[in-house]
Amino acid sequence: CSRGITGWKSYKRENALNTQENTHSCLKSVVCDRKLFNFKDYPRPKHSWEETIIYELHIKSFTELIDKNESCFKKFLKKIPYLKELGITAIELLPIFCFDPTDAPNGLENFWGYSPINWFTPHFEYFSDESAEKNREEFRRLVEECHKADIEVILDVVYNHTSEGDSQGPAISWKGIDENLYYFIGEDKNYQDVSGCGNTIAANRGLVRKLIIESLKCWSSEFGVDGFRFDLGIALSRGENLSPLENPPLFEDIDCEPELIDIKLISEPWDCGGLYKLGNFPSKNT
């Protein structure tokens, strides 16, 4: 799966809404070195849940008042002493998956990032330049410095839907590869939606859950991330026809994955389809 994306300067979301040729304005994948995180020099802090104090932040807004000429991730390094002084043990970064800033109505900007177009790549706007390799190194450095300060890094991850919208939305990634595999689609050919964003990922189908597991492993082993908070996590427990599953295969895979054993897992226990599992979440480790 692509670890890097390029083409943002020429990207136009509207050109992916129909069947016209859009090679000149679509995003391109970049092959990157899958370098593993250096846990020997920057080991995980591994704070117990009892002593964990989480500081949730958006990387762009948190660093907005610092030097405008530096990237968000570089500016964040200057704030680590402040976070350490607060006494927190972990930061929870609001979505940093690559997302579409133009996925917003009436010419507005999508600021928060809850509209991913790739589950393996950090968002381009938070870096110094467009080099995918340099971007990966920059985020890895952030995690290294947090570990040095005894601070864990938790990511707010969005696997329940994507930026491709409903059946009339743009074909950016998953939709163009195999929309019938990745999304729940009704007999009327319309996308079924319990995310409130136009589509819902069919997370318990074999190839889809494998992709999600590989994404989690990527952030854990290649970037050194210490935990994940699943946006609308209970939506990931739905099976065919959006039926809730008692033992969702995805959660079983996460629970049994050796590379995720020491990872902190947090989840929202609800979705926009009315499913609510507070205190009864179908995963032993979440």
List each model region and its residues.
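Internal hydrophobic scaffold segments of catalytic domains
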Residues: 1-10, 91-93, 160-161, 273, ...
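Substrate-binding/active-site clefts of carbohydrate-active enzymes
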Residues: 49, 58-74, 78-224, 232-259, ...
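Generic enzyme active-site microenvironment
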Residues: 54, 154, 229, 266
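Intrinsically disordered, low-complexity boundary segments flanking structured domains
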Residues: 16-19, 38-45, 106, 169-170, ...
